[in-house]
Swiss-Prot record:
Name this protein carries in UniProt: Biotin synthase
Domain of life: Bacteria
Co-factor requirement: [4Fe-4S] cluster; [2Fe-2S] cluster
Pfam family, one: Radical_SAM
Keywords: 2Fe-2S, 4Fe-4S, Biotin biosynthesis, Iron, Iron-sulfur, Metal-binding, S-adenosyl-L-methionine, Transferase
Cofactor details (free text): Binds 1 [4Fe-4S] cluster. The cluster is coordinated with 3 cysteines and an exchangeable S-adenosyl-L-methionine. Binds 1 [2Fe-2S] cluster. The cluster is coordinated with 3 cysteines and 1 arginine.
GO molecular function (one): biotin synthase activity
Catalytic function, reaction form: (4R,5S)-dethiobiotin + (sulfur carrier)-SH + 2 reduced [2Fe-2S]-[ferredoxin] + 2 S-adenosyl-L-methionine = (sulfur carrier)-H + biotin + 2 5'-deoxyadenosine + 2 L-methionine + 2 oxidized [2Fe-2S]-[ferredoxin]
Class in the EC hierarchy, top level: transferase
Reported function: Catalyzes the conversion of dethiobiotin (DTB) to biotin by the insertion of a sulfur atom into dethiobiotin via a radical-based mechanism.
Record has Repressor as a keyword: no
Length: 318
């Protein structure tokens, strides 16, 4: 019996794989690995697909030095900078996306964390949205304190996003202005405040497959509900502008392994799909059951209507 079949049976019996068992899958055929990851997804998660969109609610001038990010003030990138968007702009975007068939909507803001006035402003917007539209609200506002997280929760936000980005070991190679434990503390505080958690990372930063596996196990320990997987789209002006883009095989292998490690979570194909050949179609058949649609924060994405058509053609329910 191959390791793929053996470990599929173990997972479907309700057990979790160890890191050593996952490492045994590294040399398996990628096509078989992806197909089996998809079978695990279908057995444990069904065919329901979770589709979300984001809006860049505050852009640029970030004091953090994440090497991949166009919004860092440490690097010379050609992006538009602005403070918190007004309520009407955010609400119009949320309602428009809801009418297109999107399930979730997230406001994402640059910077280490919002200040009190910014939290106040967005809480008012979230309350208005909750009263106006049935789209599920998510938020990504950095390393907030518990008290601010609780205010967001009380305003109608149901899921908080904070990416680990990579493994603990590799993190200091991409960011030195905050610590891995700052992220974990924020995630734990968000859970304490009553949020579901969306946390994943970026692949293609120069990390190894071992780093990706380590990150996935940390996410499993944190019991997150949604794991967005971004593919680095190198931005001119950042230290990673010349980083080699991952092969599609490496992307598919990573997604499939994540399903073996995280059998019941939403694995969400996120930024970077425009740089791969089929806009993520094969990736969506590798254990994935969620995606971010539309434009990303500082890069173009894929039109939502095009995404929904592709997702339905693959047999998912949107």
């Amino acid at each position: 019996m191959s390791n793929i079949i053996k470990y599929k049976k173990k997972i479907l019996n309700g057990d979790l794989l160890t890191k050593e068992e996952v490492e045994e899958l590294l040399e398996e055929d990628i096509t078989d690995l992806a197909a089996t990851a998809n079978e695990i997804r279908e057995s444990l998660c069904g065919n329901k697909f979770d589709l979300c969109t984001i809006i860049n609610g505050k852009s640029g001038r970030c004091q953090e030095n994440c090497k991949y990010c166009a919004q860092s003030a440490h690097f010379d990138t050609d992006i538009i900078e602005y403070n918190i968007l007004n309520s009407d702009r955010i609400m119009n975007s949320a309602i428009s996306n809801y009418n297109k068939g999107v399930h979730r909507f997230s406001v994402v803001t640059s910077g280490r964390a919002l200040n009190n006035n910014e939290v106040d402003t967005l809480c008012k917007t979230y309350l208005k949205l909750k009263e106006t539209c049935s789209i599920r609200l998510c938020a990504s506002h950095g390393l907030l304190k518990y008290e601010d997280l609780k205010r967001l929760k009380d305003s109608g936000v149901t899921r908080y996003h904070n990416n680990l980005e990579t493994s603990r070991k590799f993190f200091t190679k991409i960011c030195t202005t905050h610590k891995y434990d700052d992220k974990i503390e924020t995630i734990k505080n968000a859970k304490k405040a009553g949020f579901e958690i969306c946390s994943g990372g970026i692949i293609g930063l120069g990390e190894t497959m071992e780093d990706r596996i380590d990150m996935a196990f940390t996410l499993r320990e944190l019991s997150v509900e949604s794991v967005p997987v971004n593919i680095l789209n190198p931005i001119k002006g950042t230290p990673l502008e010349n980083q080699e883009i991952l092969s599609y095989e490496e992307i598919i292998k990573t997604l499939a392994l994540f399903r073996f490690i995280l059998p019941t979570v939403q694995i969400r194909l996120a930024g970077g799909r425009t740089i791969i050949s089929d806009k993520g179609k094969k990736a969506l058949e590798s254990g994935v059951n969620g995606a971010i649609s539309g434009d990303m924060l500082t890069t173009l994405g894929i039109e939502t209507s095009e995404d929904i058509k592709m997702i339905k053609n693959l047999g998912f329910e949107v």
